[in-house]
A protein has these predicted regions:
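Active-site pocket-lining segments that scaffold enzyme catalytic pockets across diverse folds
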Residues: 136-138
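His/Cys-centered metal/cofactor-coordination and adjacent catalytic loops
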Residues: 12
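Terminal accessory/targeting
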Residues: 1-8, 17-128, 140-281
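Active-site histidine-anchored catalytic micro-motif
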Residues: 131-133
Length: 281
């Protein structure tokens, strides 16, 4: 009989208290057993407390190089920050600088190691590494990210291998998926060469669409044998989170999908085991 494992991960844990509240609810009422904590998030300390109160929640490090706040002083990582001392707004801006050779890899290493050190100081038993907007899979950055994981004695990493042609929604989305697919294949080879554990399959948002209840049920209906990670960004209040995160995302829909009775019923009916990164073989 096929073995089905579901690994739902809440990204951006610690970014905002309303995200932390959603993570808490999704653990207590739904199928969430994994979250990745943003070291520079404004609600970092709040998220740490949520994690301490929910030991069943596997917590990883959400390496951040865009759309957030650095752990290092801006003067120590000048190629990574704007004149305001924050990261570039999004992956597009970062990649533009990256392709022009304007991102110093020593700055990347310094910042990501500082993020790892901050996570280590929490004393939480960490499970894995991933990143905000998939930046850890860029050439060169993947090598540093794996080094960061190793420095924390971690041997599990997200590789965002998204199918190219499922649920096609236009050329823009296809281009985004093609880029992510290429980076993921290159990153997977490096991760496997260093004996990192990686989920067998990956689902979640690409080009902005939320994993609402219907989408989640579709993922479960077509679940493949092995471990499938579903990347999600739950939150409790779109009206506050959209401007706070500068992202037109349906945080509430993803929270509702995770706690949905229909989702829980399908998980039970298909005998799917809900896991986190600790359970990866």
């Amino acid at each position: 009989m096929p073995n089905y494992q579901l690994l739902v991960n809440a990204d951006d844990f610690g970014r905002h208290v309303l995200i932390d509240q959603a993570v808490k609810r999704c653990v207590e009422e739904g199928c969430l057993r994994s979250a990745t904590l943003m070291p520079g998030g404004k609600a970092f300390d709040d998220a740490v407390e949520v994690a301490r109160c929910h030991p069943e929640l596997g917590v990883g490090i959400h390496l951040t190089l865009v759309n957030g706040f650095p752990v290092c002083e801006a003067k120590d990582i000048p190629s990574l920050v704007t004149k305001e001392g924050v990261f570039f707004d999004n992956h597009v801006e970062f990649v533009k600088h990256f392709l022009k050779g304007q991102i110093a890899m020593e700055d990347v290493r310094r910042e990501l190691m500082a993020q790892a050190a901050k996570m280590e100081r929490t004393g939480l038993p960490l499970t894995h590494v991933d990143s905000h907007q998939h930046m850890h899979m860029l050439p060169g950055v993947i090598d540093i990210s794996l080094d960061v994981a190793s420095s924390l004695h971690l041997d599990a990493v997200r590789i965002s291998r998204t199918p190219l042609f499922t649920a096609f929604a236009g050329m823009g989305q296809l281009i985004g998926r093609l880029g992510l697919f290429t980076l993921s294949e290159l990153s997977l080879r490096k991760a496997k060469r260093r004996h990192f554990r990686v989920p067998d399959h990956f689902e979640g948002i690409v080009a902005g669409e939320a994993v609402h209840e219907g989408h989640f049920l579709h993922i479960l209906k077509d679940l493949r044998p092995g471990t499938t990670e579903v990347m999600m960004h739950p939150g409790t209040d779109n009206e506050k989170l959209i401007p706070a995160c500068d992202w037109e995302h349906d945080f509430e829909a993803e929270m509702q999908a995770i706690v949905s009775p229909k989702v829980r019923r399908m998980i039970a009916d298909k005998a799917v085991k809900v896991v986190n990164y600790r359970d990866l073989k």
